[in-house]
């Protein structure tokens, strides 16, 4: 069951977060699961127990993923000037810059809804334990209702369908049925991957 620590809003730290760094960490994690020579030489821990520990850490690292290759927030969660009416209105999600990108599942879960409406355009909703995540304004849906997904599985392609002024990825998040700032998802991914990289360095 997915668990998160709620934050009030998306900070500047998450407005533009390159996943290249995370990818580099992933490569490091994968390298450390090979022969284990570097880790064994640095810490003196080797053998079956060390291999099992490394594998567990790598599996945890791979249990989360960012939804796009690059995270750049173009419109955060909260009140803003509505791009259509010009009036102050609550924005119940977060908008990410995108251009024909594959939208990836952030955690293991199940597709609970797919569809299209005038507001969200084409959308996919995934359930991850107590967390429901919706990806909206897609140009194409790549999964069907009831599909089990793993982290990094493509569920759609970004687009500009529905009530949209241009291509982007709109993400909404409901935690225990309550709308929350999707920035907590990026924080969750960052924290898990950072903890795993640190753990590998200590093995």
For each feature predicted by the language model, list its residue ranges.
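Surface-exposed, glycine-biased beta-strand/turn segments
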Residues: 10-122, 151, 203
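Residue-level recognition of beta-strand microenvironments
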Residues: 76, 114-115, 141, 158-161
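Short hydrophobic beta/alpha edge segments that flank linear recognition/processing sites
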Residues: 96, 123-126, 150-162
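Short polar/acidic secondary-structure junctions
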Residues: 101-102, 116-117, 160-163, 174
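Short histidine-centered loop motifs in beta-beta connectors
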Residues: 104-105, 114, 128-152
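Short aromatic-glycine-enriched beta-strand elements
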Residues: 119-125, 167-169
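Acidic, glycine-rich catalytic/binding loops that coordinate metals and/or anionic ligands
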Residues: 144, 151, 172-203
């Amino acid at each position: 069951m997915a668990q998160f620590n709620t934050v009030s809003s998306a900070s500047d730290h998450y407005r533009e977060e390159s996943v290249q760094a995370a990818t580099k960490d992933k490569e490091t994690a994968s390298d450390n699961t090979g022969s284990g020579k570097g880790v064994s030489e640095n810490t003196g821990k080797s053998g079956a127990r060390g291999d099992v520990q490394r594998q567990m850490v790598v599996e945890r690292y791979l249990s989360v993923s960012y939804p796009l290759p690059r995270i750049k927030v173009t419109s955060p969660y909260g009140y803003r000037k509505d791009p259509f009416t010009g009036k102050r209105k609550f924005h119940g999600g977060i908008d990410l810059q995108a251009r024909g990108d594959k939208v990836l599942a952030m955690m293991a879960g199940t597709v609970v809804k797919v569809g299209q409406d005038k507001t969200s355009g084409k959308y996919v909703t995934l359930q991850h334990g107590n967390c429901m995540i919706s990806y909206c304004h897609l140009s194409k849906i790549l999964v069907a209702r009831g599909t089990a997904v793993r982290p990094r599985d493509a569920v759609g392609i970004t687009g500009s369908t529905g009530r949209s002024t241009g291509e982007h990825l709109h993400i909404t998040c409901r935690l225990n049925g309550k709308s929350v700032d999707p920035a907590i998802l990026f924080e969750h991914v960052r924290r898990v991957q950072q903890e795993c990289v640190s753990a590998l360095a200590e093995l």
